[in-house]
Amino acid sequence: MKVIKFGGSSLASATQLEKVLNIVKSDPERRFVVVSAPGKRNDEDTKVTDALIKYYKHYTKGVDVKADQEWIINRYQAMVDELGFKSTEMTKIAKSINDLATLPIEDNDFLYDTFLAAGEDNNAKLIAEYFRNNGIEARYVHPRQAGIFVSSEPGNARILPGAYDKLEELRESDEVLVIPGFFGVTPDNQICTFSRGGSDITGSIVAAGVKADLYENFTDVDGIFAAHPGVVHEPHSIPELTYKEMRELAYAGFSVLHDEALLPAYRLSLIHI
């Protein structure tokens, strides 16, 4: 049984999503798919998460948000159009984006987190539908339903100990479960995010919870390199690392894997790819 996580750059376009589909189809052991929000399609593009931050700032400052809402909704619609299938989820996605601007601003410590989490959450809905339209029995699972219960620390959520028992129940499903990364739900039902880049954390937590044999982390680079491939020409790859070595690299700024994703995996002796 495997848990796989796809970063934003791996989910940025129809071409990338077709690759994701083939990766999932190629191995029936890949039963849990954790997804980030759509990333940049090119250097001039905007990440959906950054667009949601802009939307949040405009909303809380009383600025008209119609353009923000339309851009985000059209971003998801563009992927559907490029993939060439009729989505029934798009109506729900559009409503969820628009409904953010109806949430209370005053005394709402989790408003920012709720805005940001919409990127991953809506992407998971869309990807699960895309899988179903292409022969994979897939189901979207909200972190609340999955059992990803976290502490009430906006922007810095921590998984609660009892969450792992609930997550283990997901093993019983025969479907491919698509779970949004980056956020969980507090005991009083508030959306609360991990730190930025926290989809890695979700993937590791899910892998530990379902007692996966392997946790695969797909990103836009083929492995871990000795230097940044965008700065150094053809740096050599590092085929194997201990948890301690990976932790030190993550703390030093290597962005391939979030440093907080290591502990859940370490406790279960999981393998990262």
Regions found by a protein language model. Name each.
Residues 271-273:
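Conserved small/polar residues in nucleotide/adenosyl-binding loops
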Residues 1-262:
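Nucleotide/pyrophosphate-binding catalytic subdomain
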